[in-house]
């Protein structure tokens, strides 16, 4: 039962919580010095994120309802499952975090705070074709 699960205040390492679709009643650590992977969540209602994270995977979310991202996330924020950005509040500054929003079906309601444009990834980048390298041996 997740409601009775307890974590230490600070986790030094990655935390993966799988097989749950809701975070209602879940008490996470105050700080995760690593990655927090909750990709199985389909709703963020009731989710209270740690005050500090090195990365966040919530690729199962299809709606941002209830999601409150804080500024103190330094790695990748994977929200690639979101279909809509309506109501999504992005962090107002980045400590190097890149925010994946590659699943959006429309950009309606998407507000990217000033200075955050370089950190938001809206579409998968096509791999660039490799050019052959010619080496002349004498």
Question: What name fits each language-model region?
Answer:
Residues 1-2, 12-22, 28-43, 48-63, ...:
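Concave beta-strand-loop units of leucine-rich repeat
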Residues 1, 134-138:
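Terminal non-domain segments
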